[in-house]
C-alpha cells in the first residue's frame, strides 16, 4: 500500500499505539455535530434529521442542537467516497453520476504529504473500511517536505523561505520541476538550494547546445519510427536510449520519480551529449539518426 517502507513502519507504529480522538471543535464553521438536547427532560439523541421538531422521548419542542462542530479531519476522512454519491440516496440535486461510486471507489493512488498521514490518510482508511468495506486507495505516495539547503524547515521568521515565483523568474519552471523530481527520494525530505538549481540549469544548457549543434548540421529530423538506424554510432545510441526508456518506465510505475529523473539526466548528458554528440563530429552520416534519437530524448524529458 505505502510506496515507502519507512512511511509504512511509521504508520503501523502509530496505529498500534493509537489514542482516543476528540472529534468536537469549538469553531464557528464546520459540520455541526448531529446531537440534540431536550430542555424539558434532558434527553440526548443523535439523528439524521437536519432539524427535528420535538423530543422523541417526551414530545416537547424545547430542544437545541449541540453547538460544537466536527473536527475538520472527521469530514475529510469521508472524502474518498462522500463526493461520489455515498449517503445521498433520494437527493434531488445530484452533483455526481449514477455510477461514480462504483467506478471510482476505491481509487488507484493517493498522493499527499507525510505530515498529514495520521490526520487524513489513516482516518480515510478507517472510514473506508467501516462504511465501504474496503480501503479507499490501492497505493499511497507520500511526497517529501521541501526544506532549505541545510535541512531546516522553511519559515518566514527564519528568513529561509524560497519563493517559487522568484525561482521561476530566475531559473524557469522546467528547471524547478526537474530539480524537485531529481531530489524526490521516497521517505526523505528535499534539501533545496541554489546549487541544486544551478546543476539542472547546466543540464538544460547541455540539451540546448546539443539541439543547436544538430540543427546547424541538418534542417529537419524525421521521427524515429520513419527511419532505419544503420550507422554504428546510431545503433549504439539507439540501444542506450531503449535501455533508458525501460528504466524510466519501471521507475515511474514504482513512483520513483528521482530514479526516473536520474535516468534521464544520466542518458541525456553522459551518454547522448558526452558520447553521441562528440563522436558524431567525426561521423557526419550519423547526424540525422542522432537528431531523431534526440527528439525521442526530449519527449522523455
Spans of model-derived segments:
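Conserved, non-catalytic sequence blocks in retroelement Pol enzymes and Pol-derived host proteins
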Residues: 285
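Alpha-helical transmembrane bundle of multi-pass secondary transport proteins
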Residues: 227, 231, 235-240
Amino acid at each position: 500500500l505505502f510506496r515507502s517502507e519507512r512511511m509504512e513502519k511509521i504508520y503501523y507504529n502509530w496505529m498500534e499505539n493509537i489514542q482516543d480522538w476528540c472529534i468536537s471543535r469549538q469553531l464557528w464553521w464546520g459540520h455541526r455535530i448531529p446531537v440534540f438536547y431536550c430542555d424539558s427532560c434532558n434527553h440526548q439523541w443523535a439523528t439524521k434529521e437536519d432539524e427535528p421538531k420535538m423530543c422523541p422521548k417526551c414530545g416537547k419542542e424545547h430542544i437545541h442542537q449541540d453547538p460544537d462542530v466536527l473536527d475538520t479531519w472527521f469530514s475529510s476522512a469521508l472524502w474518498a467516497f462522500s463526493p461520489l454519491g455515498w449517503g445521498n440516496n433520494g437527493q434531488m440535486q445530484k452533483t455526481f453520476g449514477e455510477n461514480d461510486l462504483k467506478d471510482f471507489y476505491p481509487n488507484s493512488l493517493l498522493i499527499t504529504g507525510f505530515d498529514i498521514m495520521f490526520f487524513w490518510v489513516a482516518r480515510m482508511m478507517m472510514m473506508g473500511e467501516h462504511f465501504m468495506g474496503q480501503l479507499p486507495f490501492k497505493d499511497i505516495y507520500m511526497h517529501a517536505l521541501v526544506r532549505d539547503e541545510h535541512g531546516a524547515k522553511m519559515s518566514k521568521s527564519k528568513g529561509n523561505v524560497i519563493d517559487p515565483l522568484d525561482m521561476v523568474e530566475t531559473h524557469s519552471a522546467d528547471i524547478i520541476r526537474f530539480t524537485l523530481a531529481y531530489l524526490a527520494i521516497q521517505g526523505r525530505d528535499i534539501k533545496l538550494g541554489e546549487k541544486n538549481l544551478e546543476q539542472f540549469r547546466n543540464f538544460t544548457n547541455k540539451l540546448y547546445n546539443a539541439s543547436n549543434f544538430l540543427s546547424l548540421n541538418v534542417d529537419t529530423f524525421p521521427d524515429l519510427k520513419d527511419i532505419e538506424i544503420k550507422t554504428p554510432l546510431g545503433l549504439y545510441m539507439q540501444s542506450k536510449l531503449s535501455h533508458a526508456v525501460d528504466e524510466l518506465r519501471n521507475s515511474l510505475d514504482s513512483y520513483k520519480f528521482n530514479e526516473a529523473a536520474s535516468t534521464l539526466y544520466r542518458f541525456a548528458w553522459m551518454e547522448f551529449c558526452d558520447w553521441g554528440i562528440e563522436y558524431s563530429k567525426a561521423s557526419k552520416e550519423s547526424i540525422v539518426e542522432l537528431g531523431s534519437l534526440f527528439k525521442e530524448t526530449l519527449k522523455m524529458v
